[in-house]
Amino acid sequence: MENQGTRTQQIRQVLLLFVLLGMSQAGSETWSFSVAEEMQSGSFVGNLAKDLGLKVRELSSRGARVVSNDKKQRLQLDINTGDLLLSETLDREELCGSIEPCVLHLQVLMQNPTQFLQIELQVRDINDHSPIFSEKQMLLEIPENSPVGAVFLLESAKDLDVGINAVKSYTISPNSHFHIKMRVIPDNRKYPELVLDKALDYEELPELSFILSALDGGSPPRSGTALVRVVVVDINDNSPEFEQAFYEVKIRENSILGSLILIVSAWDLDSGTNGEICYTFSHASEDIRKTFEINQKSGEITLRAPLDFETIESYSIIIQATDGGGLFGKSTVIIHVIDVNDNAPEITVSSITSPIPENTPETVVMVFSIQDIDSGDNGRIVCSIPEDLPFVLKSSVENYYTLETERPLDRESTAEYNITITVTDLGIPRLKTEHNTTVLVSDVNDNAPTFTQTSYTLFVRENNSPALHIGSVSATDRDSGTNAQVNYSLLPPQDLHLPLASLVSINTDNGHLFALRSLDYEALQAFDFRVGATDRGSPALSSEALVRVLVLDANDNSPFVLYPLQNGSAPCTELVPRAAEPGYLVTKVVAVDGDSGQNAWLSYQLLKATEPGLFGVWAHNGEVRTARLLSERDAAKHRLVVLVKDNGEPPRSATATLQVLLVDGFSQPYLPLPEAAPAQAQADSLTVYLVVALASVSSLFLFSVLLFVAVRLCRRSRAASVGSCSVPKGPFPGHLVDVSGTGTLSQSYQYEVCLTGGSETNEFKFLKPVIPNIQAKGLGKNSEENSTFRNSFGFNF
C-alpha cells in the first residue's frame, strides 16, 4: 500500500508539471474572442478554463481576473464556471468609429505563479444605423441652357456602420429629366451625382422635385432620404454696362480711413436676379485689396488702409459688375494719390573723420547725403549748421554734402564740437531733421609748458640733511597726451662758479627739488638757478623759470668774544681809579656772532664777580661800569666773568674773564702779575690789531685822555701798582660778521690804556676799531693795519 501511494503521488507531480508547462505556454499566446455589439450585460463571450485547458478550481485558487489598460471593466470572469461575460453593452461605433475590425485588448491576471494572458475581443458590427443626409432638402439652380449629360453633384449620406452595413447605393424617384450616378472615391466613400438626361425649358418646367434615397448593405437594409428641388434658371442674355468706361479720381495721401473715394454705377436690362448687379474688384492685386474696399451693392469705393505717395503714386483698378445670371461688365478706375508733406528729410552719413588734428585747415570731417521722398516743394530741402562753429558745409554731387573745417582749430580752446546738422524741406508745414555728431579735436604740440610762477623762492634752513625735499616747481601744458607730459631739468647756471650740480637736484617727472648736501648759511646765504620744463611732443617745446633758494640761518654759532680775547692765557687787567664815580666805564666786552638775525642778537650779563654789587654790565652793549663809589675797604683786585648769550633757539653763549685793579693814581708803574709775564711776547702782535681798530678814532681818544687827566689832577690818591695789559698773540677770526652793531666795534669805539711791562716809562697805545668786511656770498676778511705810534707822557701825582 505504501508503494502504491508513493507511485500515485509521483504521477500527480508529473501531471502538475505538464499543467504548469501548458499554462506557461498559454501565457505567451493571444486568445481571441468575438462578440456582436449592443449585446446585453452578462452575455456569454467564451469559457476561459476550457480554452486554457485548466480546471475551474485552479482559476479560483490562482485569483484569475480580467484587467485592461484603460481601466474599464468591459469583461468579467466567473471563477465558478470559467466563463467570460460582458460587463456592459458594447457600442462598436463609440469604441472604434469607422475603424474595422474593432478589436479590444484585455489581459487575464493569474497569481501563484504570476501570469498574464493576452485576450483580443473583436466587436462585430450590426446594422443598427441608417444612412442620414445632413440636409433634408437640397436646392439646385440649373440654367435652362445646360447641355444634356451635364453632371451636378449632390450631397452624400452618412452611415455610422461599417463594412456591408455602410451606404451601398443611391436612388432617385422616377422623373423625366435626370438619373442618378454614384461615384466612388479612393477612401471607398460613395457620392451621388445627378445627370441631366433631357434639356430643361424654363417656360415649360420652371421647377421639379424628386426623392433621393441612400441604402446600406445590411440585412435587412436601412435607408435614408432627402428632397431634391431643381429650379430652372432663366437665360441671362444682357450683360451689365457701366455709366463710364473709365473713372479717374484724386485723393490726398493723408485721408482718413473710411473716406469715400468714388461711386461706380452700372445697369442691366434683364429683370429679376439677372438684373441684380454685384460690384467687385477684378484681378486686383493684394495691395489694392488691402487698401480699398467696394460695396458690392452700391458700388461705393472707400479707403481701407493708409495711403503713401512715396510707396505708390497711383492705383489702376478694374471694377467688375456681375448680374445674377453670371454676366458681367467692366470699367477701369484710376486713383491718383496726392502727395502731402508727411515725410521729414533723411540724412545718411557716408563717412566721418574724428578726431581731426587741430592745426589742419579745410579738413573734411564728414560726408553725408540728404533726401526727402516727398515730391515738389515737399521734397526740396536745405541744409545748415550753426553759424558760431568753425565749420562750413559744401555741396557736392547731387544731394551729397561735405562738412569741412573753415579755419585751423585750437584743441586747447575747444576739445570737441557738438555739431547739429539741420535739414529742412520747403513743404507746408515745413519738416526738419536734425543729426547730431561729435567731432573730437586731436592734439598737436603747439603749446610749451607753462610754469605756475615765473620765479620761485624757496627757503632752506642751514645744516639740512642731504637729499632733503626743499620745494617743487610745477608746469602745465595745455596740450594733451604725450604732448602734455612734462619733464623737468636743471639748466646750466649763469654763474659759472656756482656748483649747482652739487647743491640741488630735480625729479624729472614731478619737479621736486632736493638739496644734495648740507647748506651753510655763513658760507652761502642764497643762490639762483633756472629750471626747464620740456614736453614730450615732436618737436619738443620747453620753458624755464627762475628759482631762488634762500638759506635760513640756524643758531649754529656761539658768540665769539673779540675783546678781551679768551685764549687760555692770563686775562686782561683793567685799571680803575678809586676816585671813579658810579657808572664809571671800566671796559667794554666786545663780541660777535657768526649767525644772523635774532640768532646774532647778543646780550650781556655779569655771571661772577669777586665782590658782587661793585660792578655791573650793560645788557645790550657789554659795557662794564662801576655800580657805586669805591672805598678804601674794597679789595684792590677783582675778577669778573661776563656771560655773552645770543637770542637763538636754543640760545648759545660764551664767557669773558677780566681782572680789574683799583688804583689811587698812575704815578708808579704797575708791574705785571706773575701769571701775565709769559704773555708779554704776544702783546706786540695784538697791539697791531688794537692800533688798527683805534686809528680811526684817534681824535676821540685824545679828548678822552685829556678828560681823564683833568679828573686825576683834581683828585689825588695814592698810587697803585701798575699792571700791563696782556694781549694774547694771534689773529682775529676772519669769519665774524657784525649783524646789528650791538656789542661790536663797527658802530662804537673803545680805547684801552696799557703800560708795557718791559719799559720803565709810560706808553700809550692807540688802537683803531676793527671793522670786518665780509661779502654776502663768500668768506673773507679785509683788515687794515695802521702803524703804531707811541708818545711818552710824564704824570706827577
Curated annotation (Swiss-Prot):
One of its GO terms (cellular component) is synapse. Keywords: Calcium, Cell adhesion, Cell membrane, Glycoprotein, Membrane, Repeat, Signal, Transmembrane, Transmembrane helix. Glycans are attached at N418, N436, N487, N567. It is found in: Cell membrane. The chain crosses the membrane at residues 691-711. Residues 27-690 are extracellular. Residues 712-797 are cytoplasmic. It comes from the Eukaryota. It is a single-pass type I membrane protein. Residues 1-26 form the signal peptide. GO terms for biological process: calcium-dependent cell-cell adhesion via plasma membrane cell adhesion molecules; cell adhesion; chemical synaptic transmission; homophilic cell adhesion via plasma membrane adhesion molecules; nervous system development; synapse assembly. Residues 35-133, 138-242, 247-347, 352-451, 456-561, 568-671 form the Cadherin domain. InterPro entries: Cadherin-like_dom (IPR002126), Cadherin-like_sf (IPR015919), Cadherin_C (IPR032455), Cadherin_CS (IPR020894), Cadherin_N (IPR013164), Protocadherin/Cadherin-CA (IPR050174). One of its GO terms (molecular function) is calcium ion binding. Potential calcium-dependent cell-adhesion protein. May be involved in the establishment and maintenance of specific neuronal connections in the brain. This is Protocadherin beta-11.
